Curated annotation (Swiss-Prot):
Gene label: hisE
Annotated protein name in UniProt: Phosphoribosyl-ATP pyrophosphatase
Entry keyword annotation includes Protein biosynthesis: no
Pathway linked to the protein: Amino-acid biosynthesis; L-histidine biosynthesis; L-histidine from 5-phospho-alpha-D-ribose 1-diphosphate: step 2/9
Catalytic reaction equation(s): 1-(5-phospho-beta-D-ribosyl)-ATP + H2O = 1-(5-phospho-beta-D-ribosyl)-5'-AMP + diphosphate + H(+)
Species: Mycobacterium leprae (strain TN)
Length: 93
């Protein structure tokens, strides 16, 4: 993988989001999304999955990568909301 100056790993993102869920900063969009519930998170994941699909068919790789990163973000927020760890998912890979 080609490294850039601002690389955040899947594990880094999960740790950051978990910390936000734990500390609940008042200005956090992640906290607001967690408070919105599973149904709203599920809708957001479906929306992002559709955007990934469309980007894969019609957009350059940079746009596709951004859409995939957003899908991963929302998937991790849903995982945290349901109490899943990365290891819970890794065991299924």
């Amino acid at each position: 993988m080609k490294q850039s100056l601002a690389v955040k790993t899947f594990e880094d993102l999960f740790a950051e989001l978990s910390e936000r869920a734990r500390t609940r900063p008042t200005d956090s969009a992640t906290v607001a999304s967690l408070d919105g519930g599973i149904h709203a998170l599920g809708k957001k994941i479906l929306e992002e999955a559709g955007e990934v699909w469309l980007a894969a068919e019609h957009e350059p790789k940079e746009v596709l990568a951004e859409e995939i990163s957003q899908l991963l973000y929302w998937t991790q927020v849903l995982m945290i909301s349901r109490g899943l760890s990365l290891d819970d998912v890794y065991r299924k890979l």
